[in-house]
Amino acid sequence: MSGFYDVIKPKTARPPVWFLRQVGRYMPQYKELKGSQTLKAFFHNTEAITEATLLGPSLLKVDAAILFADILSLLDGFNISYDFSPGPQISFSPYEELIFTKDPQETFSYLLQAIKNLVKALDVPLIAFAASPFTMASYLLDGGASKDFPKTMAFLYQYPDKFDALLKKLTEGTVIYLKEQIHAGAAAIQLFESSSLRLPSELFSRYVTAPNTQLISQLKQCIASPISLFCRCFDENFLDLYSIGADTLHPDYHVNLNKIYKTVPQPGSLQGNIDPTLFLLPQDQLLAHLEKYLTTLKDQPNYIFNSGHGILPETPLENVQAAVLCLTSISTS
């Protein structure tokens, strides 16, 4: 379970470094690039996707680029209406039949051409991504992001068979969506199970472990590229993810990575999972936290340094740059 690490590892003996949401509103250069475009228009603009993605490696000097897109881009394949005002707003009925596009290359041409452009322009690997099934379903049923996803949970409890059918349809579409991105040139896949923290522990296996196992299994039947799963959960549920077949596991900041390394006999490749609020601290305090964090992690095999959630909009760019400089200056013993 180290293929994802192998794709992005640097030539020097240190952990690779990249971040969730490493390009975004905290960057003045991104704000200038976006200008007055709506977010949806920006996400459908091949040149904008290309230029925004390049900001990560160029400004931060990280070891990988992640495609600048949104998890809702998948919905183009289902012809589901959505917008950002400013957050995600989705028009969806759980009783409508989901049919995925028969021509994904045309439907996602704006994204696939950006990937082809980026592969030529980048000197680091490009990561494609998508939401995992439960997370995508939660956005659909609640009409966007939500703290507690009440409509999702009510539908799940009241109509478990229909919810399972929705997860199956989303899985099928996601496989096609990601397969096309890999064929366009992306080197690896990051899956995001961002809504999973809402689930009671006893439902985690059914709605997170099982659907992600199916998704990863189907992906590996048609592509050879490595897959990482980011999942919001606690230590107990995180251990359940070792059965899903991912090449790398990426917990959010709720999981104690040191504990995982001490208690799991073969922890495999892990990435994460520093709390992104630490990037808001004065630089000396931030760097002190990073050095403490890496004391035990930097020598772990196949470890990738990353954040435990996306970089916050109010983060000073210079703090992230200082963090990368600190992290890329270390060496393993």
Swiss-Prot record:
Pfam families from the entry?
URO-D (PF01208)
- GO molecular function annotations of the record: uroporphyrinogen decarboxylase activity
- Catalyzed chemical reaction(s): uroporphyrinogen III + 4 H(+) = coproporphyrinogen III + 4 CO2
InterPro entries for this protein: UROD/MetE-like_sf, Uroporphyrinogen_deCO2ase_HemE, Uroporphyrinogen_deCOase
Please name the SUPFAM superfamilies in this protein's record. UROD/MetE-like
Is S-adenosyl-L-methionine among this UniProt entry's keywords?
no
Tell me the domain of life: Bacteria
The pathway where this protein functions is: Porphyrin-containing compound metabolism; protoporphyrin-IX biosynthesis; coproporphyrinogen-III from 5-aminolevulinate: step 4/4
According to its UniProt record, where is this protein located? Cytoplasm
Q: Where does substrate bind?
A: R21, Q22, V23, G24, R25, D70, Y139, S194, H309
Q: Where would you say this protein principally sits, based on its record?
A: cytoplasm
Positions of the record's site feature: Transition state stabilizer: D70
Alphabetical UniProt keywords: Cytoplasm, Decarboxylase, Lyase, Porphyrin biosynthesis
Q: What class of enzyme is it?
A: lyase
What Enzyme Commission number(s) apply to this enzyme? Answer: 4.1.1.37
Q: What are the annotated GO cellular component locations?
A: cytosol
Looking up CDD domains in the UniProt record yields: URO-D
Instruction: Provide the GO biological process annotations.
Output: protoporphyrinogen IX biosynthetic process
Quaternary structure and partners: Homodimer.
* Function recorded in the entry: Catalyzes the decarboxylation of four acetate groups of uroporphyrinogen-III to yield coproporphyrinogen-III.
The family assignment reads:
Belongs to the uroporphyrinogen decarboxylase family.
The record's section on PANTHER family has:
METHYLTETRAHYDROFOLATE:HOMOCYSTEINE METHYLTRANSFERASE RELATED (PTHR21091), UROPORPHYRINOGEN DECARBOXYLASE (PTHR21091:SF169)
> Which named protein is this?
Uroporphyrinogen decarboxylase
